[in-house]
Structure formats: C-alpha cells, structure tokens
C-alpha cells in the first residue's frame, strides 16, 4: 500500500505576478524551486493564506530571482502580494515513509530563503 505524503513545501512565499493569459502553471524562481526539490512539470498544490483558495497546478522554472507567478485561469485565485504555501506530495510505501523527511523551505516577503 502507498500513501500520499508531503514531499516538499515552500512556506509563505509572496505572489509577485499573476498572468491570466499564459497557458497555465506556477512560475517559481529556479534556485528556490531546486532548493525545495521541485521539478519542472511537477504537480503542486497552492494554498493562498490571504483568501483561503486552494488549487493544483504544475511548476515552470523561472529566471527572475524571487519570482512566484501564477499563470492561466488560476491567476484569478490569487492577487499580487498574497502569501501562499506551495506543497508537493509523493506516493510512498511504509518503508519510504519511515525514512522520509519533507523538504521545507521558509522564505521572507521577497521570497528570499530564510531557512531550509
């Protein structure tokens, strides 16, 4: 049997842009994404602390430092300046669960890394 477990999290990131006319996804600063073990195309769940919205999308790696941009239809669920939690999950069996520790990255209001 497998269980969906927290794989990684970027905690309290700030939305820097929302692009309704893009195809979809969330663009995340590449360095930040890699530190959080997020990969291009990986499914993530976004939780907006300001308005309570919760939605799923996939990761695109961004070039701008500190960039967190929600794209496509999901751009209607956030506002620039909103604080979000970006979560990724992985399917794990009992042995993997026992050995796993989620990667948690804390950031400040400019999406600069505070702690990993």
From Swiss-Prot:
Amino-acid positions noted as binding substrate in the UniProt annotation, renumbered to this chain: 57, 72-74
Cofactor(s) listed: pyruvate
Xref: InterPro entries: Asp_de-COase-like_dom_sf, Asp_decarbox
Molecular function as annotated in GO: aspartate 1-decarboxylase activity
Residue positions where Pyruvic acid (Ser) is found in the record: 25
Record function comment: Catalyzes the pyruvoyl-dependent decarboxylation of aspartate to produce beta-alanine.
Family of this protein: Belongs to the PanD family.
This protein's name: Aspartate 1-decarboxylase
Organism (species): Helicobacter pylori (strain HPAG1)
Encoding gene per record: panD
């Amino acid at each position: 049997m497998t269980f969906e477990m927290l794989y990684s999290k970027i905690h309290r990131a700030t939305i820097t842009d929302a692009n309704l006319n893009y195809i979809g996804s969330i663009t995340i600063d590449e360095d930040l994404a890699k530190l959080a073990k997020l990969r291009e195309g990986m499914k993530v769940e976004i939780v907006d602390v300001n308005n309570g919205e919760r939605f799923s999308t996939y990761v695109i790696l961004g070039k701008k430092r500190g960039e967190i941009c929600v794209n496509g239809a999901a751009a209607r669920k956030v506002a620039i300046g909103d604080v979000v939690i970006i979560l990724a999950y992985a399917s794990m069996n009992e042995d993997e669960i026992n050995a796993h520790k989620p990667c948690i990255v804390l950031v400040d209001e400019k999406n600069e890394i505070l702690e990993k």
